[in-house]
A protein has these predicted regions:
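Cytosolic beta-strand hydrophobic patch enriched in CBS
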Residues: 55-56, 124-126
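Short, compositionally biased low-complexity segments
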Residues: 10-22, 66-74, 131
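A short beta-strand signature within small-molecule sensing/ligand-binding domains used
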Residues: 106, 115-125
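Structured interaction and signal-relay segments at domain junctions
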Residues: 42-109
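Short, positively charged and aromatic/hydrophobic N-terminal segments
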Residues: 1-10
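Short hydrophobic/glycine-rich mini-motifs in sensory/regulatory modules
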Residues: 126-132
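PAS-family sensory modules
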Residues: 11-51
């Protein structure tokens, strides 16, 4: 997923994946461990897709938070800054809602220009124990 987001800092401090996961009261230890395993193995996906990957979760307040980020090593990343812990802007929430409800990949209908590149957000909802 490639996003160019203007975002607010999450709690005004350096975000930590484990801390962000704790904002989900419905996530048990098994859910958190599964997500840690997921992001531990996703570098190869970023490399093969030539794309920045962002793991976006809804926190306990219903806001979408960037919980983890992976940059490809096969191409230059379009995202120079670390966005982990940032709140996703309202302008992308409708797309995220649709992606969370979908049963497969969800591709944005809007192309954006980032630098000299045209990018399209592609969302891949991940589910574990009935949670997205």
């Amino acid at each position: 997923m490639v996003c160019n987001l203007a975002i607010d800092a999450y709690y005004g401090c350096m975000a930590d994946f484990s801390h962000i996961l704790m904002t989900r009261p419905d996530f048990g230890d098994d859910d958190r461990e599964w997500l840690h395993q997921l992001v531990a193995d996703w570098q190869v996906i970023a490399d093969l897709s030539f794309a920045d990957l962002l793991l976006i979760l809804q926190n306990g307040e219903g806001k979408y938070i960037i919980a983890e980020q992976c940059r490809p090593s096969t191409v230059m990343s379009l995202r120079a800054e670390d966005v982990v812990g940032n709140v996703v802007p309202e302008s992308l929430c409708a797309e995220l809602d649709a992606a969370m409800d979908s049963e497969s990949l969800f591709r944005s209908s809007k192309l954006r220009t980032v630098g000299k590149a045209k990018v399209c957000n592609v969302y891949a909802p991940v589910r574990h124990n009935g949670k997205t």
